[in-house]
Swiss-Prot record:
Its EC number is 5.2.1.8. Residues 2-155 form the PPIase cyclophilin-type domain. The keyword Nucleus applies. It catalyses: [protein]-peptidylproline (omega=180) = [protein]-peptidylproline (omega=0). It comes from Dictyostelium discoideum. InterPro entries: Cyclophilin-like_dom_sf (IPR029000), Cyclophilin-type_PPIase (IPR024936), Cyclophilin-type_PPIase_CS (IPR020892), Cyclophilin-type_PPIase_dom (IPR002130), Cyclophilin_A-like (IPR044666). This is Peptidyl-prolyl cis-trans isomerase cypE. Keywords: Cytoplasm, Isomerase, Nucleus, Rotamase. The lineage of its organism: Eukaryota, Amoebozoa, Evosea, Eumycetozoa, Dictyostelia. Interacts with snwA. Its main location: cytoplasm. It is found in: Cytoplasm; Nucleus.
Amino acid sequence: MTEQTVTLQTTVGDITLELYYNHAPKACKNFYELSKRGYYDNTIFHRLIKDFMIQGGDPLGNGRGGESIYGKKFEDEITKELKHTGAGILSMANSGVNSNGSQFFITFGPTPWLDGKHTIFGRVKSGMKVVQKMNAMQTNNDKPIDEIRIIKATAN
């Protein structure tokens, strides 16, 4: 399979994400297809915790919404090879075991306590300066004060 990426055009700048199909095929297919369908277009990053992560992918914008392409929550794809070792890791947000939908997060630094709990399915290929800029933004109750929006998600 040729490398597939997704570019998030955000109000802060562009981030291109490389997807790890060999390690997490279901999560990658879900993210890629949702991006292709315009599912993430005009959604916000609803959660930002400095030096931890930024979370998006919820069409409701409050952390409670989102569906997968599979019509329901899908199972985790945890591998021992992939760990949350630094900034720029792309991982599925969930509410417990096997509860993946459409929400995802990008790490701002090492988050080893998430290993074995969240499916890693990619990394930032380009746009780390944009991710760093997001990390520096002010928040109120873990929500960015100045809204960070995905204008368009493009499946490449």
